[in-house]
Amino acid sequence: MPSISIPADPTNPRQSIKAFPIVINSDGGEKGRLVKQLRTTYLNDLDTHEPLVTFINTYGFIYEQDRGNTIVGEDQLGKKREAVTAAMVTLGCGPNLPSLGNVLGQLREFQVTVRKTSSKAEEMVFEIVKYPRIFRGHTLIQKGLVCVSAEKFVKSPGKIQSGMDYLFIPTFLSVTYCPAAIKFQVPGPMLKMRSRYTQSLQLELMIRILCKPDSPLMKVHTPDKEGRGCLVSVWLHVCNIFKSGNKNGSEWQEYWMRKCANMQLEVSIADMWGPTIIIHARGHIPKSAKLFFGKGGWSCHPLHEVVPSVTKTLWSVGCEITKAKAIIQESSISLLVETTDIISPKVKISSKHRRFVKSNWGLFKKTKSLPNLTELE
């Protein structure tokens, strides 16, 4: 099967996301305090002609509170309850924040109530109770609440039970500055569309998870031959392209490989709606595929919509994109099983934003490895 390789440089910061080191303050007693931390990322080099916007993500813990209690500060909350589980609450896109000021100090004003519900699957309702004024222009703050998949946004949703009130208290704050043109997401229904009249363009990313040799992840994923963690293959649906011509065999393969190469695809990774893959088509986009890209040929694919289990791993473990391939398949499932994939490795990996730098903190290990951690600073 013909293939075209994509250049990759795992050392490039454009293919990584920096993670928060774990820092605990202790006064010599039994309890430890997990220090609040801020991570800022700048993607302004991707498009210097566009105004900047910011994406805010918070990572922290859900605490339980007896029914009937009023909302209390996190210091009092921590003394009464231990963390139930970890979670991610995404505030979404908002205006440029030229100065963050004492944003970590203002996180004490950030409180979110958590309710569990269900439709076709379990869901979580996050309602903003108190928030720092600096975030008042961001999507979730303006809406006031959001209902999301429990599996995608909560580490262990099975620990959230009836008869209790729960609060989310953020500990880690991620702020990403990026050009406004980048923030385009393909509507979900479009990504699900299949037709016998189109070819489907997929993107396969080989992601190296930078875990330790004794990590349980090594048993779940393929160990890296270089001894640097483990590898996972992630597929994204990029677009559909109408078929044209009446070519067969090698001529057909060459036609689609050339069409894919002409798009000049480039991939990056950044913390936008959580860990997010950014695709940029620098070349010619076929007319039938233009709806899958925004202004300037950009499209974003939040990984929690594609691989929730891997995404929750990336909350606390670093990763880097090592390879990227374009896969051209029949869009129709009945035709897909009768044909072979056309693989084009000519997908560029962004030289500056290819990595999530290895993480030294772990949201998922707190209650296990640090059972006395009940307060947040």
Curated annotation (Swiss-Prot):
The UniProt entry, under Gene3D superfamilies, shows: Viral matrix protein, C-terminal domain (2.70.20.60), Viral matrix protein, N-terminal domain (2.70.20.50)
* Subcellular location(s) per record: Virion
Does the keyword Zinc belong to this entry?
no
Q: Which domain of life is it from?
A: Viruses
The UniProt function text for this chain reads: The M protein has a crucial role in virus assembly and interacts with the RNP complex as well as with the viral membrane.
Q: Name one GO molecular function term.
A: structural constituent of virion
Q: Which InterPro entries match?
A: Matrix_C, Matrix_N, Matrix_Paramyxo_C, Matrix_Paramyxo_N
Organism lineage reads as:
Viruses, Riboviria, Orthornavirae, Negarnaviricota, Haploviricotina
Q: Which Pfam families match?
A: Matrix_Paramyxo_C, Matrix_Paramyxo_N
Annotated motif FPIV motif, positions: 20-23
Sorted alphabetically, which keywords does the UniProt record give?
A: Host-virus interaction, Viral budding, Viral budding via the host ESCRT complexes, Viral envelope protein, Viral matrix protein, Viral release from host cell, Virion
Name recorded for this polypeptide: Matrix protein
Domain commentary? Late-budding domains (L domains) are short sequence motifs essential for viral particle budding. They recruit proteins of the host ESCRT machinery (Endosomal Sorting Complex Required for Transport) or ESCRT-associated proteins. The matrix protein contains one L domain: a FPIV motif.
Where is this chain primarily localised? virion
A Gene Ontology term for the protein's cellular component:
viral envelope
